[in-house]
Amino acid sequence: MHERVYEVAGDSHNAAGVDLDSCNTWGTGFDALCGVWRDPDFDARQPSFYYARVIENPTCRWSQKLCIANHIRCNGQAPVPDGFEPCCAENHVRTLQERAWSSPIWYTPNL
């Protein structure tokens, strides 16, 4: 069995992003998505499964919002208050993209 990904609705190349200094987002998104799709490789003799995967446009992670709310600047011009050092760490993850998956739909051929 092999897995393939098909884009059915939305736009994965919509240039959406987030301003890391304010957490304001830009780019287009969708309030709702709907699509109809047929498997171009469907073979009634082979078992298969299908599921929907949704990926949200980027947003600020909670820790980045905390850094902004406390006016943390990582430019070296002012000391970073105790406890906020992770705001300026190289490995600080500032954004995230939430993901969701549906339950699979299984197809089993009558053998």
Label the model's feature ranges.
Residues 1-111:
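C-terminal functional module detector
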